[in-house]
Amino acid sequence: MKLNVDGLLVYFPYDYIYPEQFSYMLELKRTLDAKGHGVLEMPSGTGKTVSLLALIVAYQRAYPLEVTKLIYCSRTVPEIEKVIEELRKLLSFYEQQEGEKLPFLGLALSSRKNLCIHPEVTPLRFGKDVDGKCHSLTASYVRAQYQQDASLPHCRFYEEFDIHGRQMPLPAGIYNLDDLKALGQRQGWCPYFLARYSILHANVVVYSYHYLLDPKIADLVSKELARKAVVVFDEAHNIDNVCIDSMSVNLTRRTLDRCQSNLDTLQKTVLRIKETDEQRLRDEYRRLVEGLREASVARETDAHLANPVLPDEVLQEAVPGSIRTAEHFLGFLRRLLEYVKWRLRVQHVVQESPPAFLSGLAQRVCIQRKPLRFCAERLRSLLHTLEIADLADFSPLTLLANFATLVSTYAKGFTIIIEPFDDRTPTIANPVLHFSCMDASLAIKPVFERFQSVIITSGTLSPLDIYPKILDFHPVTMATFTMTLARVCLCPMIIGRGNDQVAISSKFETREDIAVIRNYGNLLLEMSAVVPDGIVAFFTSYQYMESTVASWYEQGILENIQRNKLLFIETQDGAETSVALEKYQEACENGRGAILLSVARGKVSEGIDFVHHYGRAVIMFGVPYVYTQSRILKARLEYLRDQFQIRENDFLTFDAMRHAAQCVGRAIRGKTDYGLMVFADKRFARADKRGKLPRWIQEHLTDSNLNLTVDEGVQVAKYFLRQMAQPFHREDQLGLSLLSLEQLQSEETLQRIEQIAQQL
């Protein structure tokens, strides 16, 4: 249908629309009109993706000079594929309405691992190996040698793309990863470089967060993108952690040993080249004196090691004299390596700021700050000059150079923690140097500054006001939306006591208490008897899950549960988990019913939707606090308190509740879906925890469901499931939670829609 959203004509590819979708579009349009950033929380399963695409594409067509591109960032490959499918639907609706093909290009971009079609490269399992192999076939000097001698290994797909692919832009249309690969096979072009080349003139680009947030990748892929773009971070409740990970470096003893052998290899190569081709080293020296940035010289295939710091921090001047010649630079790296090794020989934990680390470095081995800043850039130049084909082997040394560049660039927002052993195994010496970023706003700041509108959206962003604080930006709109329901299809409840009135909680003091573990077991047992099909249960950590399940086994509870449903368990091994998931779904299909035991913050809690009968109940055993004894976390909490005045307890509770909401939100994936949300811990009933749940869950959490015993919870569940079992047709939803075009235009409906969004 065609909608009028605040004066903008929007094509919406379905016959009916949810009221909150319309409300969401209104907020989005306000954000785009103001050319500012927005934070929007929309309940899961209410068609967030299609509303975003429909509105922004309509905006692009109405104001082609204002918004030139939509950059849609999602987390996992399946999510990227989902967005592309929605976009395809939207475009075919446009074409059907207008009766002509639109000059519109939308495509997905992923890593070489997901896009490469070269027969020698595709069988490799790990992304790092694929990148290394690709580089060894496409680097400019490899190609130059191939021009001389055609028998040498090369990549014909890249050669073809280089000759023909650049002249012919991608034909208009929507391309997911498989479409790109199919096109590559047909034309004989490399799909990965074709996609990277095409994002510059595409109308919609869908890719992963890292392409914008990780400076090492963003520098290669996204730096040409125009300012007049709208960036959407979908499922962005975890965005601060992505920012922090992209700027942090961990160095272990093993990494440093491998750095040593990397340096030895480079030393030998330099000596060999000195004897055979000294001119090459002289040319490099001259380039470094002139201070040319390597990037402009190197072709796209070579620019493999990008600078780990943000673009505005990279120095544009010549490389310092002390590291210009190859031998001097290798000697410099050796001194740095020896110093870091020496620092790892500690007996107790050390925590210090980057300036303190640098002054120690200057005193011990006379290394100044300035040459350190050029480390990453200088190593990139050296590996290029020495024509090192497989860069994957040099990743330890690259890591060390990245650390050197980061530690000398940033004085604030980072901390260095040296731990002599892992807390869990204090007897085994396993020293690690954590160079940890504590300020999430560092990585995302260039994105906010460069693009005119950035939208952060997810189903679980409560409390909204904490995101602008920790990411340090000023949104023009902040809104959270409720779920309009014709029947209440979610039933959240907090179970705080067992049938024997013992308070149940996963807190440290009562964690080992046999009565608490027994009551948790009883809860699962009784729920498995009344809930049809699938139940997903989340524990706070792998360790806690293992000890609880072992205890249930001894008490004979597991045996009783298995009479009702089959049990599957998520483990830390990805392959095992996917088999468990597959079998879990099979058991739900067969009507045998199944229970999946998994972990908050694990793979299952983030990216997997339990649609309809795959998840009729989600049980959250305990409050999923992060491991609070971690020193990195303590340093970050201190930083948040000093810089942004966020109290430690507030942040920890916020973090736990966003993960809890993320877990229970897996059950509701649409308005026709229904599910129980069981919070099994008495602490959830406290106002500070409950108030941090998303508004659409809070609204249905009645006072009568706050501190139930297991029996009372089971009674509530029975009553709810009996109601949900009544036939439910689309007609029941019309006018309430599903609107046709006529209904949408009535005054009364528009007033109701006004109340859906709650601005902050």
Curated annotation (Swiss-Prot):
Post-translational modification comment from the UniProt entry: ISGylated.
Entry-linked CDD domains: DEAHc_XPD, SF2_C_XPD
Residues reported to bind ATP: 42-49
Binding site for [4Fe-4S] cluster: 116, 134, 155, 190
SUPFAM superfamilies found in the cross-reference section: P-loop containing nucleoside triphosphate hydrolases
Enzymatic class: isomerase
GO cellular component, one term: CAK-ERCC2 complex
Keyword Transcription: yes
Family: Belongs to the helicase family. RAD3/XPD subfamily.
Protein name per the record: General transcription and DNA repair factor IIH helicase subunit XPD
Gene (name only): Ercc2
